Swiss-Prot record:
It catalyses: S-sulfanyl-L-cysteinyl-[protein] + uridine(34) in tRNA + AH2 + ATP = 2-thiouridine(34) in tRNA + L-cysteinyl-[protein] + A + AMP + diphosphate + H(+). It comes from Nitrosococcus oceani (strain ATCC 19707 / BCRC 17464 / JCM 30415 / NCIMB 11848 / C-107). Its EC number is 2.8.1.13. Its main location: cytoplasm. This is tRNA-specific 2-thiouridylase MnmA. Residues 95-97 are annotated as: Interaction with target base in tRNA.
Length: 367
């Protein structure tokens, strides 16, 4: 029986390259597609798109598979970057990688691939897909340190039915060894850690190109004036670096952390010590909910959740709220739950879905 045609989203990195190699070895008619989703005329010196494209093309040449490319820069700007900027303008901390997966990799790319006559797409994500009781399930990758299901919670039944994750059963060291043994030209390339498709940049400088900074007061929770901040959009809860207030007189020597924001007053709150009570919350609300199965579990529902990537699963209970919101009550206090970030729900290894944090019961959140 002939296997279906699959196109691999090639980034130029090791993971997607090994994904293509494994599919070819498994007998899939495989091709590669390189997506260009960002155009930055003001910063060509830092742009690595040309090198990434060259690496992706070199891999397809070595494997003997066809190479395609597509420019989705307009879709990325309209569906991802505009939202990214708006969230920062409102003082929240968005996660563009999640939106990028939903709107670009598993929507625009998927539609493009199907239009080219392919049946499946594949990526280098560390996650797994299976079928149980007539539906597709999104599962954590075997490599718990690299598991990327947190970034994929917006996928639904259609996307999962057309997607393969060839690295889902592997650990990162195995992937690197496979790349070396196959003599892939990019086998020693380091993993990217920047914003999805934008890359690694000096974030503060980058953001200031698109949003005017609004400096304001920096105070302690006791209202003591500490100094000025450069703009609330540059800071996130729990942040330690880049505050510019180290070595203050009359301080106890402990490092300073961002513990709160008052958006109406444009005030940034800072305090010494990581465990300040303003950073702790037991209850949060979330909206923009998505369920992988297409519907929520029966509420109230006990499960686990992550409020940030690579966090240990936290036990919680989900309860219903009207108008598309959900309340999450944790068994233990959470550190720096941040509006704008994703909360993702799990039952053992299965990713159930998630949403966007809107508010918490932490004292430092004032919007």
């Amino acid at each position: 029986m002939n296997k279906p045609k699959v196109v691999v989203g090639l980034s130029g990195g090791v993971d997607s390259s090994v994904a293509a190699l494994r599919l070819q070895q498994q007998g899939y008619p495989t091709s590669g597609l390189f997506m260009k989703n960002w155009v930055d005329f003001a910063d060509e010196s830092e742009c690595t798109v040309a090198q990434d494209r060259e690496d992706a093309q070199a891999v397809t040449s070595l494997l003997g598979i066809s190479f395609h490319e597509a420019n989705f820069a307009m879709e990325y700007w309209d569906r991802v970057f505009h939202y990214f900027l708006e969230e920062y303008r409102l003082g929240r901390t968005p996660n563009p990688d999640i939106l990028c997966n939903r709107e670009i990799k598993f929507k625009t790319f998927l539609d493009h691939a199907l239009a080219l006559g392919n049946t499946l797409i594949a990526t280098g994500h560390y996650a797994r897909i299976d079928q149980k009781e007539g539906r597709y399930r999104l599962l954590k990758g075997r490599d718990k340190n690299k598991d990327q299901s947190y970034f994929l919670y917006t996928l639904g039944q259609k996307q999962l039915s057309h997607t393969l994750f060839p690295l889902g059963e592997l650990e990162k060291p195995q992937v690197r060894r496979i790349a070396i043994q196959a003599r892939l030209p990019n086998h020693s390339k380091k993993d990217s850690t920047g914003i999805c498709f934008i890359g690694e940049r000096r974030f503060k400088e980058f953001l200031s190109r698109y949003l005017p900074a609004q400096p304001g007061e920096m105070r302690t929770p006791d209202k003591e004036w500490i100094g000025q901040h450069d703009g609330l959009m540059y800071y996130t809860l729990g942040q330690r670096r880049g505050l510019g207030i180290g070595g203050r007189k009359n301080s106890n020597g402990a490092p300073w952390f961002v513990v709160g924001k008052n958006l109406p007053q444009n005030t940034l709150y800072v305090a010494q010590g990581r465990h300040h009570p303003w950073l702790k919350s037991l209850i949060l609300e979330a909206n923009q909910l998505h369920w992988v199965a297409g519907h929520p579990p029966p509420l109230p529902y006990s499960c686990t959740a992550k409020i940030r990537y690579r966090q240990t699963d936290q036990h919680c209970t989900l309860t219903a709220i009207a108008n598309g919101y959900i309340k999450v009550i944790f068994n233990a206090p959470q550190y720096a739950a941040t509006p704008g970030q994703a909360i993702v729900f799990y039952q053992d290894d299965e990713c159930l879905g998630g949403g966007t944090i809107t508010t918490t019961d932490a004292l430092g959140i004032q919007s």
